[in-house]
C-alpha cells in the first residue's frame, strides 16, 4: 500500500498482505514414477506432471520513527491494547486501582506473603506459532540514510 497511515509496527513485527496474481512464471515439472534402465514404451501412467508457480517480490519499506511523551494516559491506552508491549519495554506496571479490599491484595506478589519459591520468568508465548509466514530479515538492509537506496514504483 502506498500513502499515509499504512500501518504501525509493534513488538518489532510488521505484516504485509500480498494479493495473489498469476502474472509471474508458471512452469511444469514432469517426473517419471518408475526408474528403469531400459526404455519401456511410453505410458501416461508412468509419469506425473506438476504445475508450479514462481513469484518474486521486491519489498521496500520506509519507516518513520516518532517520539511520544509517555504520560499516564498514553501508558494506560497502550496497556489496554496489549500489556506485553510495556513489559517488553521493561516498565514496571501496577494494576489499575480498585475500590474493594479483596482487589487490594489480589495483585500482591511478595514472596513473604505468598510463601513460595521464586518462579522462573515465563517465556512469552508466540501468538503466531501455529501459523506459517515468510520471514523477511531486515537486519543487514536497515539504514537511516535514505539517499543510499533507490526507491522504485
Swiss-Prot record:
Report the gene name.
L1
Q: How does it assemble?
A: Self-assembles into homopentamers. The capsid has an icosahedral symmetry and consists of 72 capsomers, with each capsomer being a pentamer of L1. Interacts with the minor capsid protein L2; this interaction is necessary for viral genome encapsidation.
ATP-binding among keywords: no
Question: What's the protein called, per UniProt?
Answer: Major capsid protein L1
| InterPro entries in alphabetical order | Capsid_L1_Papillomavir, Capsid_L1_sf_Papillomavir, dsDNA_vir_gr_I_capsid
- What keywords would UniProt list here? Capsid protein, Host-virus interaction, Late protein, Viral attachment to host cell, Virion, Virus entry into host cell
One matching Pfam family: Late_protein_L1
| Species of provenance | Human papillomavirus type 64
Any GO BP annotation: virion attachment to host cell
By sequence similarity, the record places it as follows: Belongs to the papillomaviridae L1 protein family.
Q: Where in the cell is it found?
A: Virion
What this protein is reported to do is described as: Forms an icosahedral capsid with a T=7 symmetry and about 55 nm diameter. The capsid is composed of 72 pentamers linked to each other by disulfide bonds and associated with L2 proteins. The capsid encapsulates the genomic DNA, but does not bind DNA. Essential for the initial attachment to the host cell.
Listed GO cellular component terms?
viral capsid
Q: What GO molecular functions are on record for this protein?
A: structural molecule activity
Amino acid at each position: 500500500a502506498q500513502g499515509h497511515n499504512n500501518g504501525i509496527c509493534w513488538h518489532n513485527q510488521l505484516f504485509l498482505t500480498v494479493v495473489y496474481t498469476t502474472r509471474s512464471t508458471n512452469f511444469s515439472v514432469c517426473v517419471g514414477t518408475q526408474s528403469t534402465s531400459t526404455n519401456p514404451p511410453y505410458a501416461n501412467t508412468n509419469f506425473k506432471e506438476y504445475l508450479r508457480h514462481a513469484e518474486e517480490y521486491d519489498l521496500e519499506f520506509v519507516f518513520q520513527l516518532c517520539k511520544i511523551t509517555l504520560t499516564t494516559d498514553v501508558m494506560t491506552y497502550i496497556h489496554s491494547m496489549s500489556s506485553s508491549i510495556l513489559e517488553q519495554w521493561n516498565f514496571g506496571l501496577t494494576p489499575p486501582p480498585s475500590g474493594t479490599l479483596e482487589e487490594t491484595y489480589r495483585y500482591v506478589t511478595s514472596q513473604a506473603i505468598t510463601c513460595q519459591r521464586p518462579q522462573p520468568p515465563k517465556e512469552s508465548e508466540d501468538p503466531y506459532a501455529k501459523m506459517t509466514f515468510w520471514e523477511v530479515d531486515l537486519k543487514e538492509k536497515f539504514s537511516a540514510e535514505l539517499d543510499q537506496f533507490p526507491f522504485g514504483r
